[in-house]
């Protein structure tokens, strides 16, 4: 039967033209259903439809409807009597509204199928209508009122019909008929209004008949207009109520139901009932039905009360829908199916309403009334019979069972729907479907309940009803429906408390009140009722308050009436139920508009209903505020509930969630309010639970006997009714109404208490008792007490609510709550341990207070816990404000409720209640808001502000009060008032000043320093705050720098702002640590400065932080907060912070003197007294010392930082003491523990700390440190470390310098001595001779090397300086620059090393050895021979010597053809040596001359020696030269290059050079013939000439042409020794200095030589043999292979040294640098443009680089920049050396500098070695005279196979290259030197690269090598060289002359 009616209901909604609504719900599941309902509403709302709806709606309105249908058995008559068509139409209406929404398509189809039963149909339809409305709102999301409007039409018609029938029917009869009207009513509001306008009109009429409700209805209708939200609601409930209640009650009831969802309806009905008040049992049922119709009136009344709400409904259709969908509406059409949720709620309420007298009818009719009144006791008592009756009539059990399933399901489905947003969108119909689906689950949960008893089913129905309520609440009736729904939730928890179904209840939902109901016949029903009573029951209670509110509803009823007057606030009552989430949502929604109004009106109204639950609802209302607060904390209160409170009752919780979701729908309208709303719902649920609690106790007796239940109900009813009447009559006077109500509660409660044998009952009884007590003690207090179980139920809430109905409930409860909370806690526990236990668990999840008041098993766990938790945190600090906002928002929506709503929220913040703290907090807030709390802080829970004093016996309280006021007035400088809470043993009071409340601590701080406490005869023995002060170890201290004078730190708002800031800061620092709930408790606030100061401070704030596990250690909080910077922390607190957070009590380690061995002492300077006396100083120093320890590892070993205990070290300050002395010294004594907790010894600790830099330590510590950072206390005389350090410094400062100096001296000595030895070794000549003999093949190398050496050196020099100038070459130069750049210095050193090495390893080769010896000889001879050239020559010699070493290697390389890189390097190095040797042979005579010229005896001696050796070997040398020359001539290279040089060089200079060279050669050949002076001059010229290399170097320096020539020669040399090419070629390319190289550019080379002849060294001595550069090119290809390899290297190295480093110096010696520069310039000018092009110099010029001020390197192009640079740079330095005429010194230097260059170049190839030999013999002097800038390397490069190419190709190429410049070189074969470079790489890369740059591609080395190949005899080579040198000397002579 149930299912059929449900199906019908579903059908009806379809027909009830709710299409739009259903579409809107579509978003939810409900839209289609609504649409169908709307469509089916008027016409198709047939009983079948209703049946179908009922049948299919086990989950949604139809569930509630079934009950209504059952109830309607009585009301049915009325319906039929009123209008048979009305029933069907009503059914259609109802179905369309709720069933369409709830059932959606499925339900609709079912409803269509099962429209058989009119009563069920009506109930179903009516309820469905409500659901549809809810759906519409949900769809609208509070935005869409079209559905409302559409539904309104339907509803209007249907509700009117129903209303009409309802009033006529007697309450009992009307149970069933009433059910039908109920359905129409519901449909009327949403769809029926438009669909069933007639009915609506009737309803309106009824409303008008209802004194108050009629007005409301009118208003509601007016405000709603087409929107039949009021009608719909009123229709639904009013019809039911109508059945129960008398016709006169019906109009009001209808209005109430319509407008306030069930709550409004009840309120109206209660009003009516109370007025009718007769036979509350029976009369109430009629009034209920009347209320159903009056519901319309009530709606109107509500509208009147809160036209805003009506407006709100209109504004927020969703809200309206929610209300309509709300169980209130849903309940009214309680079908067996609908009953599941709505029915159960309504059915129970109806039962309650019906009471014993009208059990069957009343049960059904009571369904509404029981919701309203049965919410509490009468609900419980009557529900059993009622349910029984109803089930019997409508097969209530069936409906109940399905209902139970539905209720759970509905709740579940609601949540699910919400989750799906189906429910949200179509709370009405979609919800139903959801409900159905969840019904099975819920049913499963419920089934145990059901098994418990038949009532369980019914209760389940109420649960289902609740689900509908949530849907309805979505609609404009959402508030009330929410209330109902919430009530259901509450009930279920209560049921759980009741006992049998506790577990089941939880599983099913908070609403599993069904289990409760099952448990006690009406227990379950009660639970349902309670749930409904939370919202719907409240409505019912308002209709039939006395019964329901008995214990909890008495107040509720009273409040209900006031609520109703308040307006929709009564609807808001619903929030007290789980719907409170929805209600809360609606409350929030109300802020949105409709929701708020509904919230305010309904909730308040509900509050009225709930007065006891009201307290509950009062909590709901406060909840609204609380919710606002809560929402801020937990926007998804329902979900929280679900998880926490309803974890067991997932489904029930789901419903709650659903409500919440609906709330969110409302939320959609007003998301802000929604969120708060959800939290509110939690609170509401708790409150509801409270409400339930009182009722269940009553009920349990009822369950034992239905009649008992009825009796209880009656008693309750009477009391409630009385109070309710009072309330109603004094709507505005909440207090009076409440007062009355509380008394009835007391009476009722008394009954309930005894009757409550079950734990639930016990709980309820406890709640009731509390209520009674508060009633007796304090009207508000009694209410609070009653509410105390629900915290919100505090009478204050009730009275306040009545008074500030809109803000209601919340404000009122706040004041009462504190008392009630305590009372409740105890009574609760005492009344029933089971209940207590339940309550206890709840508080933990929620608030401590709240939890205790609520049963943990009860819905409170589900609702309360989360909400509580949210409330707890949010409420205290922000609850009031948020709540206020929400409330105001809600109230805003309902105009009347707004103000109160605003008031209420502020109280919410208070967290006062401990047991019912959450609820209390919620209620407490309302209490504050009771009169729109005049205080800026919520004193609802005044614990924070209460001061408890123990008075002396002689103290007179009046006097004490006056004295305290006076003391405080004087201190605070403003008038204060004392609010005394207790006058006896403990004098408890709080202090206010205008709107401000002084914190307890601020008052205590004043009193304890006053005479009242400290006087000789104190009147006050002790003063303490009423709250518990945490242990000091939990306390944390924060110091504000100051507060503005306008800020009074004693005011509550200051501490609240600080608490809020601290919570925010804690959240910030812990946001990454997961979720957490922390509350801050301000323990003390003290301020230092006087009130007068412009800045009052510092302000010390001591607080404690409480988490879920209790208080957190102060050190832990301090560590957390100190992660913030002072600025950040100041930002959070809103005031500048001086000290972030320090533990109030610091942990102390073992400070025993026995552990003194671990104590460390540090003395700080500059610590002022203020800092020293700061209590934080030791802690700060501990932290800084720990940081200092963390620095130790970092300082010591960064990579081991992690392994050190740095951050893990623990420092404990033992003592801080002031010392005598200057600068405020302070001694810190402390010890250190490592990360393992092991104490470190003082020595170890101090050693660790002392590893940190003193300055760093001072920075970290923030103070200067005296002496050592740390020293053991036991050994204060710890100078040992100092003395050790001092000793160490002595060692470091003395020993190390001594060692360094010694090493330097040794090195210098070794270098100098070694150089001298090398240079002056007497066996040099012999060696040279031998070498030359051996070098015969290397004679080629000799000449070539000479040239190359000179040029090579030039190259090095060029390279050195050129690199920058020459971009392209620079790269190569860079590499060569290793030889070149470094050459100046590097070359020198390397050269020296190489030279030494060469000498050291004379075993290079036969030639190498001989070369070495010859080099030595040359080195010695050359200097001697050319004293003049000593300076230059010395460098040259020096260079050559080193070069000789290199040459040796080079020679070896040359001969062995070892890797060219090595050869190149060696060539460069060796070439100088060889050159020296070779040069020395010719030099021997010149040296003698040279010394004369040089004026240096040593030089002369050396020269003489060299000359002697040279003479001895002259023939051999000449022979070699001749061979070389001949070879070159044969090849045509020798002469040709010479020709070039001559042609290109300065003819005069070259001639001069040549002459000098010739003379030198002659002297060498004929030592006797050589005259020192002449020889020297010739030598100079000869060297210059003969070492065109030097000239070339200079030329290279001065002119790239020479460099090229050299390169050409080098190429030739490289022919044999290609290694040098890279370097040597480069060098040569710079400016050919080789006699042969000059072949191409020999003119330049000769010129250079001419230039250089002035140089101390007679570079041209060997030049004579050298043909012109052109010849050299031709002949030297062959000769230079040998000669250049030998000559060029040494001459070049020398030159390189001289040129690079030495040449300039050497030259300067003979010729000032200016001369060199002049030469360079001359070179530049000297060379003809063609030559310039050909000449490196010209190239140099081509590069755009002017020849270096010094003679441009022969290969300027290569390194014109390099060589020139080298020369330029070196020239001057070398000059001094030359000036010094320290050939050796210069040579040494050059040997160091140049040799590196020179050697590197020669090292490149064997040619280098050969050249070195030659160079040693002849070029050494030349090198001395002019370091061959074109090093042997260059020579070798030139001497390379490419030499011929250079000679021919290279000539042009070189020209081109010169023209092109270095870049061209790099691209040109010269730059191909890489192979040469490859050789030279062994040579310093600098040279190599340089050479490479100059002539990487030059084939000189090859060709020169070829030329120099051993094929030529020494004599022929020498002869050829001599000839070439002669030519070159001529050319160079002119050049030199020109330069000179």
UniProtKB/Swiss-Prot annotation:
A GO CC term assigned to this protein in UniProt: photoreceptor connecting cilium
Tissue specificity: Expressed in retina photoreceptor cells (at protein level).
Major place of residence: membrane
PTM annotation (Phosphoserine): residues: 1377, 1384, 1543-1544, 1613
Residue spans crossing the bilayer: 988-1008, 1288-1308
UniProt-listed InterPro entries: KIAA1549
Biased composition (Low complexity): 808-840, 860-877, 1421-1435, 1759-1769
Keyword Phosphoprotein in annotation: yes
Membrane topology type: Multi-pass membrane protein
Residue stretches in coiled coil: none
Basic residues bias locations: 1581-1595
Similarity annotation: Belongs to the UPF0606 family.
Function field: May play a role in photoreceptor function.
Name assigned to this protein: UPF0606 protein KIAA1549
Organism from which the protein derives: Mus musculus
Native organism taxonomy: Eukaryota, Metazoa, Chordata, Craniata, Vertebrata
Recorded name of the encoding gene: Kiaa1549
